[in-house]
Amino acid sequence: MAQKEGGRTVPCCSRPKVAALTAGTLLLLTAIGAASWAIVAVLLRSDQEPLYPVQVSSADARLMVFDKTEGTWRLLCSSRSNARVAGLSCVEMGFLRALTHSELDVRTAGANGTSGFFCVDEGRLPHTQRLLEVISVCDCPRGRFLATICQDCGRRKLPVDRIVGGRDTSLGRWPWQVSLRYDGAHLCGGSLLSGDWVLTAAHCFPERNRVLSRWRVFAGAVAQASPHGLQLAVQAVVYHGGYLPFRDPNSEENSNDIALVHLSSPLPLTEYIQPVCLPAAGQALVDGKICTVTGWGNTQYYGQQAGVLQEARVPIISNDVCNGADFYGNQIKPKMFCAGYPEGGIDACQGDSGGPFVCEDSISRTPRWRLCGIVSWGTGCALAQKPGVYTKVSDFREWIFQAIKTHSEASGMVTQL
C-alpha cells in the first residue's frame, strides 16, 4: 500500500512492481442469498444499523418510501418525471443507475402493505440529490405508482464457503475485484462499478504510466496466471483534479486519491464478474466494524506479489485514534480513514493500491457488499500503529456520478474536480 522512503510516506505505486495483502489470518464472511427487498432507511433496526427510507420490491419493483411521521410505507405516485425519480432513487440507495422504470396500478397490483402515496415536486427535482427533500403526501387520484429496477450490485452469484486461516480466496468470492496491468504486470487493484467503469486510486497513474494503450483491466479470475480471466483495453482514466501529488511531486498530501477507469467495451457480467455497491447517500462508516480488503499485493513488506487473490478482515479505526501521536499524527484528513489492528500483523501492502475495502451491511433486506474504501497509502505494511489508510468513498459519491456522466465519451487522461 505504501512505502517509507527518506522519511516520507508515499503510495505504493512509486515503485515499479507492486501487488495484494500482508500474510496473517484471512477470513471470509459467508455469502447471503437474495431476499425480498432492497432497502435503505434512516430507521433503526434491531442491530441498530441506520437505514434510509427507500425500498424497491424484488417482487414487482415497486418503489416505496417510508413516512416517518405516520410510521408507514407509501407508494410514489407516477409523474412525468418517472425516469428522473427512478434514477435518483437508485443512486441514493447506492446503485449506480436505474435500468428500467414503469407504472403499476394499485387497483390491480395491490397495496401490499403500503398506505397511501407520496408525490414528487417536479420543479424542485432537478436541484436535489435526496428524494425525501422533494416529496409530500398526496391523494394520487389515478392510483398509478412508480416501479423501477436498479442495476444489481454487491451480491455474489455463487455459494461460497467460509474461510478461516491463511488460504487463498476462491473464484466468485469477490467478483468486483479487478487487476490493473501495465505492460502485462499487475500494478494496482480496482473495483467494478458496472461492466465498463472501474473505481481505483489516482496514484496508480503517475506520469510514467499514462500511455493508456499499455494498460489492461483483468477480471473474472483470482490467479494472476489464469488463462480464463478477461482482459480489456482502457478508453479513459478520469482522476481527481484535487490530488496534489500530480500537481506538485513534492507534496505529501494524499487527499482525493481516487480515479475512474472507463473500459473500451463492457465486461460481460457473470458469476465471476459483478459490480460492487457504493455507500448509500448519507451512510456513515462505523468505527470498529470489521470489513474486508482484497488484492494481489505483496504478502510481506519486502516480499513478492501474491499469485492468487488474497483477503483480510480488518476493523475500521476512528480518525481520532488514527490521528494520534502514536499513529499518524494528524495526517489523516476528513476524506480518509484507517483500518487495521493497533498491533499490526494484517494489512494491505504494495500492489493492493486502488483495490476494494468492502463492508457487508443490511441496509437492504438483501445483504450487500458496499465499496467503503479504496486502498490508498500507509507506512510499511502491517506495522504496529501504522494501519492502512483508505480513501473514504462515501465522500466522493457526487464526484463519481458526475465524472461518469461527464466523461462517458472521453478518451485519454482526463481530470475532474
UniProtKB/Swiss-Prot annotation:
The active site is at H203, D257, S353. Residues 1-23 are cytoplasmic. It is a single-pass type II membrane protein. Residues 163-405 form the Peptidase S1 domain. One of its GO terms (molecular function) is serine-type peptidase activity. It comes from Pongo abelii (Sumatran orangutan). Belongs to the peptidase S1 family. Residues 54-151 form the SRCR domain. It is an enzyme of class 3 (hydrolase). Signal peptide: none annotated. One of its GO terms (biological process) is cochlea morphogenesis. It is found in: Membrane. This is Serine protease hepsin. Plays an essential role in cell growth and maintenance of cell morphology. May mediate the activating cleavage of HGF and MST1/HGFL. Plays a role in the proteolytic processing of ACE2. Glycans are attached at N112. SUPFAM superfamilies: SRCR-like, Trypsin-like serine proteases. It catalyses: Cleavage after basic amino-acid residues, with Arg strongly preferred to Lys. The chain crosses the membrane at residues 24-44. It comes from the Eukaryota.
